[in-house]
C-alpha cells in the first residue's frame, strides 16, 4: 500500500502513546498475513474506542497549538490569484462544451456518422485523464506557472490544426493533442487552490477557484451554437485559440508562482525565470522578509507515476472511483443531450446551446448553496470534535475525523440525484415538454456539483503535499470512466433507450454508496494507522543509522 506523507505528524512518542490502535483491529503477522480474532461487532466497538482516543476531549478545545500563518496573501489577493488560475483552467471545459453543438455539422461536412464524431469526445476525455499526470509531476517540481504556459503552447498548436483539417483521422489526433494541452490546466488550478487556502476556508474560496471551469459548461454550448450557425464549425476552434491567448496573457502578466516548495507562504521570491511580468517590472522588490521555514520539501525530479501511486491508497482509490462514477453519469447526460435535442426535438445549433444554460446556472448556484453547506459541516464537526479553527492557519488533521466533516451530507444528495437522473431519462424517452427536462437538469447540476466538490476537497485535504498529483489522479479515474460512459451511452441508447440508460446509471450511483460510506466511517482510522506505520518505519530507520 502506498504510504502518503501527512503534514503536521505527531512525534513517534506521541504516536506510540496515543495513536496505537487496539489489538482488535486487523494486524499483520511477520509473514504479512492478516489476522482478525474478534467478531465484526467487537471490531466495530474497538474502532469506535480508537477514534475516541484520537479525538481530543472537550477540555482541550481551548488549547490551540501555535501554527504559522499559511499565506502572506491578503483575502483580495487570494481571490485574484484563484480567479486567474480558474480562467486558465477554463480552456478544458470550454473545449468540451463548445464542441457539442458542432458535432452534427462536423459529421455532415466530413462525411462520417455521429457515432464516429462521438469517438473524438471519448478520446478527448482519455487524454484529459492521462495528460495531467505528467503535468502535475512537473508542476510539483518546477512550479505551477511554467506548466501553465507549456499547456497553453500545446493548446495553440492543436487549435490551429483543428481549424484547418479536412478528415476524420486528423480531427481525432488533433483533438487528443488539444486535450493534452487543455486538461493539465485543470489539475494546476486545483494545486494552486491547495497552495494558498487552508482546509477550513477552502469551501468559501471554491467559487473563485472554479469560476472559469463553471463558465465553460455554462457559456460554451451557447457560444458554440452561435458560431456553428453563423460562421461554421471551424470558427469554434478559432474562437478557442483567441480565448486561450487571452488567458495565457493573464498568466504571463499577472500570475505569480504559488508552489510551496518554491515560494513557501508567498514570501520567498521565485527563480528569476519563473516570475510574472509584473514581478519582473518591479525587479522582485518586496517589503516582505522571506520566511524560509515555510518552504516545503521539493521533489528532486518529476515522477509521472506519483498520481498512479496515490491511487494505490485505499481511501484515495475509493474517493477517486466514486467521483469518477458520478462524473461518468453526468457526462453521459450532457454528451448525448445535443444529439437527442436535434433528433427528437429538431432543434438547431443555437437552440441546443441555449438548452445547456440550466446546467451552467445550476453549477454556478451550487457554489452559493451546497459548497457553503460543506464549510458549515466542516465547522460543525470541528466544534463537535473539540478542534479550534483559526483564520489563515492550516488545520491539523492527525486528530480530526476529516472524513465526517467532508462527506457527512453527500449520501442523501446522491440518492436525490439518482432519482432526478431516472426522471430525466424517462422524460426524454417519452418526449416530455422541454421545460420539466431543463428543470431536472438544473437540479442535477446543483446537487452533483456539491457532491463532487466535497469528494475533491477531501482528496486534496488528505494529500495536500501532492495537490497537483492527486488532482491528476482524480481526473484520470473520472475522465477514463467518463470516456467509457460516453462511448457506451450511444449504442446503449439505440438498443435500450435513454430511459433505461439513465436508470442503469442511477443504479450504479446507488450501488456505489456503501463503499463510499466505508471512507466516511473508517477513513480516519485508516489514516491514523498509516501514520503510525510511517513513524514506526522512521524509528527503525533511525535505529539502523545509529547502529
UniProtKB/Swiss-Prot annotation:
Which PANTHER family does UniProt cross-reference here?
MAJOR FACILITATOR SUPERFAMILY, QUINIDINE RESISTANCE PROTEIN 1-RELATED
The record describes the protein's role as: MFS-type transporter; part of the gene cluster that mediates the biosynthesis of squalestatin S1 (SQS1, also known as zaragozic acid A), a heavily oxidized fungal polyketide that offers potent cholesterol lowering activity by targeting squalene synthase (SS).
| UniProt entry tagged with the keyword Transmembrane helix | yes
Compartmental location: Membrane
Q: Which GO terms describe its cellular component?
A: plasma membrane
Q: Does the keyword Transmembrane apply?
A: yes
Glycan-carrying positions: 118, 167, 274, 493
TM region positions:
81-101, 146-166, 206-226, 236-256, 317-337, 347-367, 407-427, 432-452, 469-489, 496-516
- SUPFAM superfamilies (alphabetical): MFS general substrate transporter
Designated name of the protein: MFS-type transporter M6
- Name the membrane topology term: Multi-pass membrane protein
Describe the family membership recorded for this protein in Swiss-Prot or TrEMBL: Belongs to the major facilitator superfamily. CAR1 family.
Q: Where is this region: Disordered?
A: 1-45
| Gene Ontology MF terms in the entry | transmembrane transporter activity
Which keywords does this Swiss-Prot/TrEMBL entry list? Answer: Glycoprotein, Membrane, Transmembrane, Transmembrane helix, Transport
Amino acid at each position: 500500500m502506498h504510504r502518503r506523507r501527512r503534514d503536521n505528524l505527531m512525534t513517534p512518542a506521541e504516536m506510540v502513546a496515543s495513536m496505537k490502535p487496539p489489538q482488535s483491529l486487523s494486524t499483520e503477522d511477520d509473514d504479512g498475513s492478516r489476522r482478525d480474532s474478534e467478531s465484526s461487532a467487537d471490531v466495530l466497538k474497538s474502532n469506535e474506542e480508537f477514534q475516541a482516543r484520537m479525538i481530543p476531549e472537550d477540555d482541550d478545545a481551548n488549547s490551540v497549538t501555535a501554527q504559522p500563518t499559511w499565506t502572506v496573501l491578503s483575502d483580495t489577493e487570494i481571490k485574484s490569484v484563484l480567479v486567474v488560475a480558474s480562467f486558465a483552467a477554463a480552456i478544458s471545459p470550454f473545449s468540451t462544451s463548445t464542441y457539442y453543438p458542432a458535432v452534427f455539422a462536423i459529421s455532415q461536412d466530413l462525411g462520417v456518422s455521429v457515432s464516429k464524431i462521438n469517438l473524438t469526445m471519448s478520446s478527448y476525455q482519455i487524454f484529459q485523464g492521462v495528460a495531467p499526470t505528467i503535468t502535475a509531476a512537473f508542476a510539483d517540481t518546477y512550479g505551477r506557472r511554467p506548466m501553465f504556459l507549456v499547456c497553453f503552447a500545446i493548446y495553440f498548436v492543436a487549435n490551429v490544426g483543428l481549424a484547418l483539417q479536412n478528415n476524420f483521422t486528423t480531427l481525432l489526433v488533433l483533438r487528443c493533442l488539444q486535450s493534452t494541452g487543455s486538461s493539465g490546466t485543470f489539475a494546476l488550478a486545483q494545486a494552486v487552490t491547495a497552495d494558498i487556502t487552508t482546509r477550513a476556508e477552502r469551501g468559501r474560496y471554491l467559487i473563485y477557484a472554479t469560476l472559469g471551469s463553471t463558465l465553460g459548461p455554462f457559456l460554451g454550448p451557447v457560444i458554440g451554437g452561435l458560431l456553428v450557425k453563423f460562421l461554421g464549425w471551424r470558427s469554434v476552434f478559432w474562437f478557442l485559440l483567441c480565448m486561450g491567448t487571452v488567458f495565457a496573457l493573464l498568466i504571463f502578466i499577472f500570475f505569480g508562482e504559488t508552489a510551496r516548495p518554491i515560494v513557501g507562504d508567498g514570501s520567498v521570491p521565485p527563480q528569476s525565470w519563473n516570475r510574472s511580468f509584473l514581478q519582473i517590472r518591479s525587479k522582485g522588490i518586496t517589503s516582505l522578509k522571506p520566511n524560509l521555514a515555510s518552504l516545503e520539501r521539493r521533489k528532486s525530479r518529476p515522477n509521472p507515476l506519483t498520481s498512479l501511486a496515490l491511487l494505490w491508497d485505499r481511501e484515495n482509490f475509493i474517493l477517486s472511483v466514486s467521483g469518477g462514477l458520478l462524473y461518468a453519469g453526468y457526462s453521459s447526460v450532457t454528451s448525448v443531450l445535443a444529439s437527442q435535442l436535434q433528433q427528437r426535438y429538431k432543434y438547431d445549433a443555437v437552440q441546443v446551446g441555449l438548452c445547456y444554460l440550466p446546467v451552467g446556472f445550476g453549477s454556478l448556484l451550487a457554489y452559493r448553496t451546497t459548497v457553503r453547506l460543506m464549510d458549515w459541516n466542516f465547522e460543525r464537526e470541528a466544534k463537535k470534535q473539540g478542534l479550534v479553527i483559526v483564520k489563515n492557519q492550516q488545520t491539523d488533521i492527525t486528530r480530526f475525523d476529516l472524513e465526517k466533516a467532508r462527506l457527512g451530507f453527500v449520501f442523501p444528495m446522491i440518492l436525490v440525484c439518482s432519482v432526478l437522473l431516472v426522471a430525466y431519462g424517462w422524460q426524454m424517452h417519452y418526449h416530455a415538454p422541454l421545460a420539466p427536462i431543463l428543470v431536472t437538469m438544473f437540479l442535477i447540476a446543483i446537487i452533483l456539483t456539491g457532491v463532487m466538490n466535497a469528494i475533491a476537497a477531501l482528496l486534496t485535504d488528505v494529500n495536500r503535499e501532492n495537490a497537483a498529483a492527486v488532482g491528476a489522479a482524480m481526473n484520470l479515474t473520472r475522465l477514463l470512466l467518463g470516456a467509457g460512459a460516453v462511448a457506451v451511452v450511444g449504442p446503449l441508447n439505440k438498443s435500450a433507450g435513454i430511459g433505461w440508460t439513465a436508470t442503469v446509471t442511477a443504479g450504479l450511483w446507488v450501488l456505489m454508496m456503501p463503499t463510499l460510506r466505508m471512507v466516511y466511517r473508517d477513513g480516519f482510522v485508516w489514516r491514523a494507522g498509516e501514520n503510525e506505520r510511517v513513524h514506526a518505519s522512521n524509528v527503525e530507520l533511525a535505529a539502523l543509522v545509529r547502529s
